[in-house]
Amino acid sequence: MSSQIRQNYSTEVEAAVNRLVNLYLRASYTYLSLGFYFDRDDVALEGVCHFFRELAEEKREGAERLLKMQNQRGGRALFQDLQKPSQDEWGTTLDAMKAAIVLEKSLNQALLDLHALGSAQADPHLCDFLESHFLDEEVKLIKKMGDHLTNIQRLVGSQAGLGEYLFERLTLKHD
């Protein structure tokens, strides 16, 4: 059955939104994996666990926001298989933060690509929606992760375990 409310919402944009929803759910799944990795008894970094579990929740909420917009525009949500995280062992906080920045940059690029598609399709509602709810948040998160990465790299040296512990205690406990 076709939508009664669909107006100026191309099938290309609809498909791209569905792909972006999948990317957000995959990111949420990855952050959940990261969070519970740092919650393990042999890793035990509570602040790092909390940081990544909060990100998992934020990405799930982002997927839901996209799905709600899809329905409001008369599009159809088509769920795809969710790919498991690329790894099960995440190593150090430094390794995990590097992986997280790569993930966030890929999400940001997908958002920019969708925004460009919306502009090309003359869809100002989509562009405004992305600008209001996603693009600024992504830039701020990438900056925050970059700052965390810089601080971790400063602390990690010959005393890598101590540096990781201090970062977790002094930085992530206050986020």
Curated annotation (Swiss-Prot):
Positions of the UniProt region annotated as Catalytic site for iron oxidation: 54-61
Localization per Swiss-Prot or TrEMBL: Cytoplasmic vesicle, Autophagosome; Cytoplasm; Autolysosome
Misc note: In horse spleen the light chain is the major chain.
PTM annotation (N-acetylserine): residues: S2
Protein name: Ferritin light chain
Keyword Iron found: yes
Species: Equus caballus
Molecular function as annotated in GO: ferric iron binding; ferrous iron binding; iron ion binding
Keyword Metal-binding: yes
Family per record: Belongs to the ferritin family.
GO-annotated cellular components: autolysosome; autophagosome; cytoplasm; cytoplasmic vesicle; ferritin complex
Binding site for Fe cation: E54, E57, E58, E61, E64
InterPro entries: Ferritin, Ferritin-like, Ferritin-like_diiron, Ferritin-like_SF, Ferritin_CS, Ferritin_DPS_dom
Role according to the record: Stores iron in a soluble, non-toxic, readily available form. Important for iron homeostasis. Iron is taken up in the ferrous form and deposited as ferric hydroxides after oxidation. Also plays a role in delivery of iron to cells. Mediates iron uptake in capsule cells of the developing kidney. Delivery to lysosomes by the cargo receptor NCOA4 for autophagic degradation and release or iron.
Coarse class of the protein's main subcellular location: cytoplasm
Domain Ferritin-like diiron: 7-156
A Pfam match: Ferritin
Assembly, per entry: Oligomer of 24 subunits. There are two types of subunits: L (light) chain and H (heavy) chain. The major chain can be light or heavy, depending on the species and tissue type. The functional molecule forms a roughly spherical shell with a diameter of 12 nm and contains a central cavity into which the insoluble mineral iron core is deposited. Interacts with NCOA4.
